Amino acid sequence: NEYILEQTKTLTENKCLILINPNMDKNYIEGLLLKNNIKGFKPYRFYSKTKDTINCKILDFITEEQIEIADKFGLIIMMHLAKKDAIADDDNINDLIYLSDKYPNVKWILAHCARSYSAWALEKGIKKIRDLKNIWYDCSTVCESDSIDALYQGVGLEKIMYGSDDMIGRMRGKYITFGKAWSAINSDNHNLALSHCDDRMTFIRYEQLRAMKRGIRNSKITESEKQDLFYNNAKNLIDSVDSRN
């Protein structure tokens, strides 16, 4: 967090989220908010109190006390859902409904199309939360056009944002899906026989952009909606937060 805050201190156009874990003190968090231009929190499942990073629930890796702070200041909480079924998991659905209702000032971002690299989870689960007013989604590193199209169709473009995932997006490879599974493939982790074709891999970010383009083509959206998807939706969401008020 100190590094992120230092990088955004002098450039007012740069905004940041701070990393949160369940053990962080309330007074420490509020002190950071009052002194810095912080737009929200980023909890992560690897900090789960249960030590189970696969099947943990939302409140295992961020506490309600911390969510209360986000609600008080109207902050963003950007989150990677856990559990194998992601947004199709009943625990995740029920928790999002509960938290969205109890903390209406929190602006939730469900990263990676609600961590649904494959379309089936969105097709199964998104209809149960699509009417929640304070949930947004980003498309970062999702490389399947069917998944992105399912999100476009499921929640409407006004709640969706492009995300670059700067650490992963610059790597060469692709997130692939089969059945209910998904994984990142790169030149070092497969033994596919590819002598019959050009086996060079492009950047994951390019694969994501290609999937977004195909999803847009399928949805027949306007030029103005494209601008919203790639810029305006995110800017409007970020501009709606002032943690120091």
Regions found by a protein language model. Give the residues of each.
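Active-site gating/metal-coordination segments in enzymes
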Residues: 1-85, 131, 135
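Distinct, well-ordered alpha-helical segments
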Residues: 1-6, 26-34, 54-56, 86-103, ...
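Internal, well-ordered alpha-helical segments in soluble enzyme and binding-protein domains
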Residues: 62-66, 92-95, 106
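Active-site acidic short loop of glycosyltransferases
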Residues: 72, 104-105, 157, 232
